[in-house]
Amino acid sequence: MLQPKRTKFRKMQKGRIRGEAKGGSDLTFGTYGLKALQPERVTARQIEAARRAMTRHMKRQGRVWIRIFPDTPVTSKPVEVRMGKGKGSVDFWACKVKPGRVMFEIDGVSEPIAREALRLAAMKLPVKTRTVVREDW
């Protein structure tokens, strides 16, 4: 599972995901990619599930790049605990994804296999997505 080795602070405020992605909106490594169309918090487990779905469908051929990293700690309080008494402990790690962000890239496989692999990955994610293809070849 993806998570940072060390962070400056243990816990983070919730915040909001506003605006479009400033960077990471173009394909950099692969020929095919999966682009987010709405703002959402994607967890490390969801990223790993999407990666597994893609690599299984591609039968270990080609290459997959993960362009997002879960660097936001999400806290939760235990079940049946009253309000107050401080912020809960870190439960999982997540990545705040803005619209326009390329989350995964694929290369080294044919177009039908790549599109199906990205479709399977999109089903594991809580974000509406679009498959993008590099045009400058």
Swiss-Prot record:
Gene Ontology MF terms in the entry: rRNA binding; structural constituent of ribosome; tRNA binding
> Would you name any one GO CC term?
cytosolic large ribosomal subunit
Q: Where is the composition biased (Basic residues)?
A: 1-16
Query: Keywords for this entry?
Result: Ribonucleoprotein, Ribosomal protein, RNA-binding, rRNA-binding, tRNA-binding
One family from Pfam that matches here is Ribosomal_L16
> Where does the record place the region Disordered?
1-22
Keyword Methyltransferase on this protein?
no
Q: Does the keyword Ribonucleoprotein apply?
A: yes
One biological process term in Gene Ontology: translation
| InterPro entries (UniProt xref) | Ribosomal_uL16 (IPR047873), Ribosomal_uL16_bact-type (IPR000114), Ribosomal_uL16_CS (IPR020798), Ribosomal_uL16_dom (IPR016180), Ribosomal_uL16_sf (IPR036920)
Where do the coiled-coil regions begin and end? none
Q: Which PANTHER family match?
A: 50S/60S RIBOSOMAL PROTEIN L16 (PTHR12220), LARGE RIBOSOMAL SUBUNIT PROTEIN UL16M (PTHR12220:SF13)
Q: Which NCBIfam families match?
A: rplP_bact (TIGR01164)
Q: Which family does it belong to?
A: Belongs to the universal ribosomal protein uL16 family.
Query: What does it do?
Result: Binds 23S rRNA and is also seen to make contacts with the A and possibly P site tRNAs.
Description of how the protein assembles with itself and partners: Part of the 50S ribosomal subunit.
Q: What is this protein called?
A: Large ribosomal subunit protein uL16
The organism named in the record is Jannaschia sp. (strain CCS1)
